Amino acid sequence: MKGVLLSGAPAATLIDVTHEIAPGDIRSAAYVLGRTWHRFPAGTIHLIVVDPGVGSSRAALALSAHGHRFVGPDNGVFTPLLHDAEVEAVELQVREGVSRTFHGRDLFAPAAAALANGEPLTSLGQKFAGIPRRLAYTPPH
């Protein structure tokens, strides 16, 4: 994923917040996102890839909220962003050649790189017609 990101946006700065989330633990990923996103400057692009539903019918999203942009699966991981915020979301289109098992590399990383290069959110896909999935979740303090 990092190679794809840097190939698409060579000037990007990449920061790994954590690698301590158990595979598929969406609730922990949402918690960490809720505790960290606001510590970054406005305009930051956050790529979240905790995705046990890869290859399923779950949507792939890019969204804008709180002056930040976020890319990842519509599996509830964005729950902490959805409270008290105006959210603009687009559904990323799965192109030919995208692996059914590695959307992080083939779908989410190219979208994040496009945003880092100044592409508007709307260039990444159609407006998301649904409501991003929410977990039963208490926001962190």
Predicted regions and their residues:
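N-terminal glycine-rich anion-binding loops that anchor highly charged ligand groups
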Residues: M1-I15
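Predominant activation on well-ordered alpha-helical scaffold segments within soluble catalytic domains
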Residues: K2, L6, A30-G34, F78-T79, ...
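A structural signal for alpha-helix termini and helix-coil/disorder junctions
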Residues: S7, A11, R39, A114-L121
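Active-site histidine-anchored catalytic micro-motif
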Residues: A11-T13, E20-Y31, R35, R39-D106
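Anionic-ligand-binding alpha/beta catalytic cores of soluble enzymes and soluble regulatory domains
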Residues: S99-H141
